[in-house]
Amino acid sequence: MENTQSASKTPKIKLDFKDSKYATGRRKTSIAKVWLKKGSGKIYVNGKLFNEYFSSEFHHLQITRPFDIINQSTNFDVRCSVSGGGPTGQAGALVHGISKALVMFDENLKSTLKTEKLTTRDSRAVERKKPGRRKARRSFQFSKR
């Protein structure tokens, strides 16, 4: 029998990122490791183009936002590894990592990206469930009689 699984897998993309800047971004429980270098505007997430990895148009706009703010959407190539959380957290972590890497390329971009709050880590996370309650804040149904 032939191994049909290996034929259906997408080929690994080899990218040269020798002269790149590295940064990590975080959001909720997601962590993004980002390598940024001068290039043609391609963004790879876990070996796939970001359009294929993230299906939502909202996430596409969110990820390209740092480049749109500095008007250099086609000047950088991005390779990143994202783990943990869901799509929204992963997209947020990716934006945070890209922004930090852009600041490493050019310190003058720091004030521009900071005013848009892209270099600041969004510390909001899910609140833990408390004992004696149904959820974090929701209590059990109360019956007078």
Question: What kind of region is each of these model predictions?
Answer:
Residues 14-26, 32-83, 88, 92-145:
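Structured, basic alpha/beta domains of bacterial-type, RNA-associated proteins
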Residues 1-19:
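Intrinsically disordered, compositionally biased charged tails
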